Amino acid sequence: MTLKQKWDVYSRLTRIDRPIGTLLLLWPCLMALMLAAGGMPDLKVLVIFIIGVVIMRACGCIINDYADRDLDSFVERTRSRPLASGEISTKEALILFVILGLSAFGLVLLLNGLVVKLSVVGIILTIIYPFTKRITNMPQMFLGIVWSWSIPMAYAAQTGEVPMEAWWLFAANWCWTVAYDTMYAMVDRDDDLKVGIKSTAILFGKYDRQIIGLFQLAALACFIAAGWSADRGLLYGLGILTFVGFSTYQQMLIFDRERAPCFKAFLNNNWAGLALFVGLGADYLI
């Protein structure tokens, strides 16, 4: 295998070629840093968290593909993944996971002790998540915890503590993650039923759209509460309204439960997250 071919395999394994997951992780993390700092976060902390998000998203993809390597070949969307197709060995994938994980932990060691402790929990959660799809119909709810863990870490890094304000943002992101990852799971639902992978898309059944809507409303309420507790103003409110607009559009996309529109709805959440981030940033700047 040439160096170019190896890079192609690694980029697909870590999803560097598909940044949507990194962006969905990044927006709430950046919001947490801004809220914790009351505006512009410490530059060192900001750089560490941005790099950390990229690395840990890659780690999550590797361990997810490792856990699903025997099932991915039966699912239309995942059968070409490097581990499922045999392009890379499990040993090589795990070595890469360890290298990236240690790199992320090395960055965390540059921060305070509370962040280090929280990061250990975060790594454990990241490793556990892929295996929850075997034992529970609600892996998206566990993913919501994993996907939101950077929020208390961001507050701890910036302030040395995790106040109630952080948990409002955590709850908002948890609800939002369950909503958009259920949309994602709707894409694979037929294949997942055949191979025994569990998901909230299967659990919610014919009420999937309605329950996604409830999670979107709960996320909205918690995002408002987080902004209220931080005394945010009109421009953050405009970001919230834009988030509502995108959420409404997503409901329209998933109405017929077809694969392509459901995937489009999932991808659209990047813009919803960006709207919240821009609204919050503008509220601090103007």
Curated annotation (Swiss-Prot):
Its cofactor is Mg(2+). Pfam families: UbiA. The chain crosses the membrane at residues 21-40, 95-115, 142-162, 167-187, 210-230, 235-255, 266-286. It catalyses: all-trans-octaprenyl diphosphate + 4-hydroxybenzoate = 4-hydroxy-3-(all-trans-octaprenyl)benzoate + diphosphate. It is an enzyme of class 2 (transferase). GO terms for molecular function: 4-hydroxybenzoate polyprenyltransferase activity. It is a multi-pass membrane protein. PROSITE patterns: UBIA (PS00943). The keyword Manganese does not apply. Its EC number is 2.5.1.39. One of its GO terms (biological process) is ubiquinone biosynthetic process. Signal peptide: none annotated. It is found in: Cell inner membrane. The keyword Cell inner membrane applies. GO terms for cellular component: plasma membrane. Catalyzes the prenylation of para-hydroxybenzoate (PHB) with an all-trans polyprenyl group. Mediates the second step in the final reaction sequence of ubiquinone-8 (UQ-8) biosynthesis, which is the condensation of the polyisoprenoid side chain with PHB, generating the first membrane-bound Q intermediate 3-octaprenyl-4-hydroxybenzoate. Belongs to the UbiA prenyltransferase family. This is 4-hydroxybenzoate octaprenyltransferase. The gene is ubiA.
